[in-house]
Design a protein with these regions (language model features):
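Residue-level signal for the "D+5" position in two-component response regulator receiver
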Residues: 27
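Metallocofactor- and cofactor-centric catalytic cores in central/energy metabolism, strongly enriched
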Residues: 48-49
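Walker A/P-loop NTP-binding active-site region of P-loop NTPases
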Residues: 52
Length: 280
């Protein structure tokens, strides 16, 4: 699990605030692997974890061993989810992502989506959970299939922010599925969603354009300490670029003496000694 630890540290260093843990792969024991990864990641980084599984037994075991307050991804109005996942969330004091789906599948329109959000919210309150336990998924679809997908998601985000006073989350990559140069679409979607009140996004923090846009958007909206965070990020990126350029132009002993045979080994040594590189 060395790779898992390395990825977790890299994600945190690049700005992730929560790490989503999903072990839903063919050919593995999901419950056992989920336990191992939670142990490794929670002891490696400071970020809280989001437990991402559709299996009830895996979710309960993950919450049982996690040394903190986790975020469940996700609970919907689907019968099995709301009847079994909500009690587990309450039992272990977890927060949860409210996914506006029902047994009928995707909501037909914005009004049905609001109805699902309200119904799941009310059920959670009846069970004794708190308002602060819930994060609503904007449920964004791909614009390749629905040209109004982005607008519908923005309306859900605004409704949760202005009417329900609930934080929101969405998966960025969904919006651009099947399109060329997806990063530009994802970045534009993110900045507009932040303006509507989006709280969190499921994304890869190593994507520099995306993260820079998020930090800049927060600053333009005058969110607390956003100016300091933006400046600190830009300074860190500038330092990394300067260090990278220093490594690239530095001559190795073999290059200085014309000994081409050993220059490959010298280059790998230089990369190994540099903090932002990993030799493969």
């Amino acid at each position: 699990l060395d790779l898992v630890r390395e990825m977790a540290m890299a994600q945190e260093e690049n700005g992730a605030r929560i790490l989503d843990i999903n072990m839903g792969m063919n050919g593995i024991d999901e419950k056992e692997m989920m336990k191992q990864v939670i142990y490794e990641v929670s002891s490696t980084v400071d970020c809280p974890l989001c437990i991402d599984t559709s299996h009830i037994d895996v979710m309960e075991e993950a919450l049982r061993i996690y040394p903190g307050r986790a975020l469940i991804n996700s609970i919907s109005l689907e019968s099995e989810k709301i009847e079994k996942m909500l009690p587990i969330a309450k039992k272990y004091g977890a927060m949860f992502v409210l996914l506006p789906l029902s047994d009928e599948g995707l909501p037909k329109d914005g009004e049905e989506k609001k109805h699902i959000i309200e119904t799941v919210y009310d059920r959670a309150m009846e069970m004794g959970m708190a308002h602060e336990d819930i994060v609503v998924d904007g449920l964004v679809a791909t614009i390749g299939a629905n040209p109004e997908a982005a607008r519908e998601c923005y309306e859900t985000i605004a409704y949760c922010k202005d009417v329900r006073k609930l934080p929101t989350i969405c998966g960025l990559s969904n919006i651009s599925f099947g399109l060329p140069e997806r990063m530009y679409v994802n970045t534009a979607f993110l900045t507009m969603a932040i303006c509507e009140g989006l709280t969190m996004a499921i994304a890869n923090p190593s994507q520099e354009l995306l993260m820079n846009a998020a930090f800049a958007s927060d600053m333009l909206l005058h969110r607390p300490d956003s100016d300091i965070r933006y400046i600190e990020r830009m300074n860190r990126l500038a330092e990394q670029k300067a260090e990278y350029e220093t490594v690239v132009v530095k001559k190795t002993p073999a290059e200085s003496t014309g000994q081409k045979e050993s220059s490959g080994a010298d280059a790998i040594d230089a990369i190994k000694d540099h903090p932002i590189f990993t030799a493969v």
